[in-house]
Regions:
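Bacterial Sec-dependent N-terminal signal peptides
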Residues: 1-24
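N-terminal, motif-rich segments that launch catalysis or mediate targeting to/interaction with membranes
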Residues: 19-127, 134-178
Length: 178
């Protein structure tokens, strides 16, 4: 599992810069990550997750946002770092960076249950993507681009929405075509 985590960070992060981060963007990231997994990492993930592949589980963390039992996780998808400051645990709003570290620890621990590891892997795949969406890591002054109103082909929108999904939707390709 340690090797899988290293590979995920090594190969997913550079590709994140190329894509948006709506459903399709997250699935693209999961699919790209899968192509770089070792055989052993694939076996470990299949043993842990069953038939689910990384691309299909990459959006789970967004899909559970409407579940009241997961409301506490809403601030895990972003972090705010004011201009001129460095990230410091617990100092600023948003917990994405802290949660990535926490989920890596869960995956490494032998004492973690299978269910804890499944949740950790699903969040880890998703949050790595979120942290590399520029509007999920910002100074907080524009609410992650949500306060910046724009027109997208004549339709009212905001910078966050355009960056998150509309840029990819405009290409009209499935995640497997990237």
């Amino acid at each position: 599992m340690k090797c899988s985590i290293k590979l995920l960070f090594t190969f997913v992060l550079p590709f994140q810069i190329l894509f948006g981060w709506g459903n399709t963007g997250h699935r693209i990231v999961g699919k790209v990550a899968e192509t770089y997994l070792t055989k052993n990492a694939k076996v470990l993930i299949k043993k842990l997750m069953g038939h689910h592949d990384l691309s299909r589980m990459s959006n789970w963390a967004d899909h559970i946002k409407s579940d009241p039992n997961w409301k506490h996780a809403n601030d895990w998808h972003w972090c705010t770092i004011p201009d001129g400051e460095d990230y410091e645990k617990g100092k600023h709003k948003g917990l994405a960076a802290e949660k990535v570290k926490e989920f890596i620890t869960v995956l490494k621990k032998r004492k973690s249950t299978k269910e804890e590891k499944q949740v950790a892997l699903k969040f880890l795949i998703h949050l790595i993507g979120d942290l590399h969406q520029p509007l999920h890591v910002g100074n907080g002054e524009d609410r992650g681009g949500n306060s910046i109103r724009l027109k997208w082909f004549g339709e009212s929108s905001n910078l966050h929405s355009i960056w998150d999904s509309k840029l990819i939707e405009y290409q009209n390709l499935s995640y497997s075509e990237y």
